[in-house]
Structures are given as structure tokens and as C-alpha cells.
């Protein structure tokens, strides 16, 4: 069953998020340093009548990497073509995409860390020299055909920057890491989104949803949609703190943004009494695969100090015991 606090996209998220997505930097809340720098780089590129350097966005899922790519497209008055690395299986797939670009276009590749080494090799000359090298034939009779490409900007997005090869990473002239959002920022996003959904969201209600959203806009917007359902059923045009609490409690999302899976994870670690538990053991105990543990469950818990990763495995912090309202011996956390 899908988790309401899942950071990966649901099938319905794309259309829903797009309808609520800001089209320019004026409407984009959060990531202030990134916005400031991008505004400078975009203004400079437009002044020189040039394409932007290639851009890499990294950070946990759901923080707005795709939104930023679309805003850059708008600000540069450029067309954007979007794909995801898993869809580029052969060098011919990438060649077809690149040869269909026009001058000044933006190519957005999501999950770029999942490109195969063979695909990366095709991408290198395209990024550096705007040239496509295609090998025809094999063995001694093989020939390389060089095709000139229009100048374009590649925007890559990744949740696992460490999996990018150094040669690929080094070809991005601009690299930005998106950070988790503050509750106050999420509350502003929620109030603006509610208006687009023909609702008014009280400030306290927005903050209540925000603090249960794991510092992630995608989750906040998904929770807002469900809270709106509760308001609609009760014929309410205004989302109140009381209604938000009722809805979120009914959805099984507690005041810290934890659902049943998070609680099972933390209960497993706290029961170990500071004895590290390996990733494989955690995955087996939770009946989840290791990638889901690393990419979905752990990022928020790590970023907020609920767990620690050591060479021997994962351990719960004192904050986890407090979150679960468990007593613990202070000596457990003494060096």
C-alpha cells in the first residue's frame, strides 16, 4: 500500500503538482540562496544572448527540482523537454532526443544518476562541444559520424549525487543542492495552493499540515489534498486547524510526520539499545527492499537527527526515544 508521506511521486502527483506549481521565481517559496544565484546567472546569460551552463540539482525527492527546471525554462523563454534516465536505455534513445532539440532548448533529465556508462559517453561531447558522436558498424570497419547539435542547456536532477560519475558531474557548470523546507515556508506554500483549490487555509491549519509534512513540499501538497476532502465532505470553505488535525490523525500521520512504517523503523532501532543494525537486517525486518529504506524512509530521519549511520549500521539517537515517548538510560549516549 502507498504511504501518504511517501516522497516518491504517485501517479496522480504529476498533474496535481503541475496545477499548483509556480511558473516563475516570484511565486517560488524557499531555497533562497539557489533562487538568488539562478536569477543572476539567468540575467547574465540573457544579457549575453547565450544558453545557460548545464545545471545539476541534487537533494531528497519532492523538494522542487522539477519545478525549478520549469521556472528556468520560463525565465529563459526556452522550450523544455523532459525525460527520465530509466527511459534512456540505448545510445540511440539519447541521440533521438538530442537531435530533436532546437537552439536554446532545455533538456531536463530526472534521476540522472541512473544513466548507464555507455549513455554517459554519448552525453559528454554533447555537453562539452554540442556534438554527437555516433559509431556505425563494429570492429575494424566501424566508423564515427559526428553530428553538430544546437546549443542547449542540460538540467539534471538526482536524489543520489554520490552515484554520479566524476566525469559527468564535472561537466555541470552549476551545481545546487536543495535543502529541506522550514515549516513556515511550507505553510506559505500550502496557503497559496489552497487558494488555487478554491479553499482558504487558516495559518494554524497550514502550520499543522506543514509540521507533519517531513519538511517536503510534495508531501505537504498531497496532505493538503486529503485535508481538503475532509473539508468538502463537511461543506467547509475554510480549512481550520481542527479539521486539519482530524484529517491528519485519520490518515495515520502523527505530529512529527511519522506514519506506521517510520514508527516500526524507529521501534526496531530503539529496541536494539544502541547496538548498530545493518541495512540488510532492517530491510528484512520491515519487509522492504534496501533502496526503499535508504531513499524513502531514512533521509528525513537522518536530516532531523532521529538516527545515525555508522560503519557497523544504524543506531537510534536520544531524539528517537523521545519521539516514541520511551525512557532510556543516559549512559547509552555517553562516549
Swiss-Prot record:
Keyword field: ATP-binding, Cytoplasm, DNA damage, DNA recombination, DNA repair, DNA-binding, Hydrolase, Nucleotide-binding
Record Pfam families: AAA_lid_4, RuvB_C, RuvB_N
Alphabetized CDD domains for the sequence: AAA
Stretch list, region Head domain (RuvB-H): 255-335
Residue positions binding ADP: 21, 28-29, 62-67, 181, 218
Catalytic activities: ATP + H2O = ADP + phosphate + H(+)
Entry similarity comment: Belongs to the RuvB family.
Its biological purpose: The RuvA-RuvB-RuvC complex processes Holliday junction (HJ) DNA during genetic recombination and DNA repair, while the RuvA-RuvB complex plays an important role in the rescue of blocked DNA replication forks via replication fork reversal (RFR). RuvA specifically binds to HJ cruciform DNA, conferring on it an open structure. The RuvB hexamer acts as an ATP-dependent pump, pulling dsDNA into and through the RuvAB complex. RuvB forms 2 homohexamers on either side of HJ DNA bound by 1 or 2 RuvA tetramers; 4 subunits per hexamer contact DNA at a time.
UniProt protein name: Holliday junction branch migration complex subunit RuvB
Species this chain originates from: Campylobacter jejuni subsp. jejuni serotype O:2 (strain ATCC 700819 / NCTC 11168)
Amino acid at each position: 500500500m502507498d504511504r501518504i508521506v511517501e516522497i516518491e511521486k504517485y501517479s496522480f502527483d504529476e498533474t496535481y503538482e503541475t496545477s499548483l506549481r509556480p511558473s516563475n521565481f516570484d511565486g517560488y517559496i524557499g531555497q533562497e540562496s539557489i533562487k538568488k544565484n539562478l536569477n543572476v546567472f539567468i540575467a547574465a546569460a540573457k544579457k549575453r544572448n547565450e544558453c545557460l551552463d548545464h545545471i545539476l540539482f541534487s537533494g531528497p525527492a519532492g523538494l522542487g527540482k522539477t519545478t525549478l527546471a520549469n521556472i528556468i525554462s520560463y525565465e529563459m523563454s526556452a522550450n523544455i523537454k523532459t525525460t527520465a534516465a530509466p527511459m534512456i536505455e540505448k545510445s540511440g534513445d539519447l541521440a533521438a532526443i538530442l537531435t530533436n532539440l532546437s537552439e536554446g532548448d532545455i533538456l531536463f533529465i530526472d534521476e540522472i544518476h541512473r544513466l548507464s556508462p555507455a549513455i554517459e559517453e554519448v552525453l559528454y561531447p554533447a555537453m562539452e562541444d554540442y556534438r554527437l558522436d555516433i559509431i556505425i558498424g563494429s570492429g575494424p570497419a566501424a566508423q564515427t559520424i559526428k553530428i553538430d547539435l544546437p546549443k542547449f542547456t542540460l538540467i539534471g536532477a538526482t536524489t543520489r549525487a554520490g552515484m554520479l560519475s566524476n566525469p559527468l558531474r564535472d561537466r555541470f557548470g552549476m551545481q545546487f543542492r536543495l535543502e529541506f523546507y522550514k515549516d513556515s515556508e511550507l505553510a506559505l506554500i500550502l496557503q497559496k495552493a489552497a487558494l488555487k483549490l478554491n479553499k482558504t487555509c487558516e495559518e494554524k491549519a497550514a502550520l499543522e499540515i506543514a509540521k507533519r509534512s517531513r519538511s517536503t513540499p510534495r508531501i505537504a501538497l498531497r496532505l493538503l489534498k486529503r485535508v481538503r476532502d475532509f473539508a468538502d465532505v463537511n461543506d467547509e470553505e475554510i480549512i481550520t486547524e481542527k479539521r486539519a488535525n482530524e484529517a491528519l490523525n485519520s490518515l495515520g500521520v502523527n505530529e512529527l510526520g511519522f506514519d506506521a512504517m517510520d514508527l516500526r523503523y524507529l521501534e526496531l532501532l530503539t529496541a536494539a539499545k544502541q547496538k548498530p543494525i545493518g541495512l540488510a537486517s532492517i530491510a528484512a525486518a520491515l519487509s522492504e527492499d534496501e533502496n526503499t529504506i535508504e531513499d524513502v524512509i531514512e533521509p528525513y530521519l537522518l536530516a532531523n537527527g532521529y538516527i545515525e549511520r555508522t560503519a557497523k549500521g544504524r543506531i537510534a539517537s536520544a531524539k528517537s526515544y523521545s519521539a516514541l515517548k520511551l525512557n532510556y538510560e543516559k549512559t547509552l549516549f555517553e562516549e
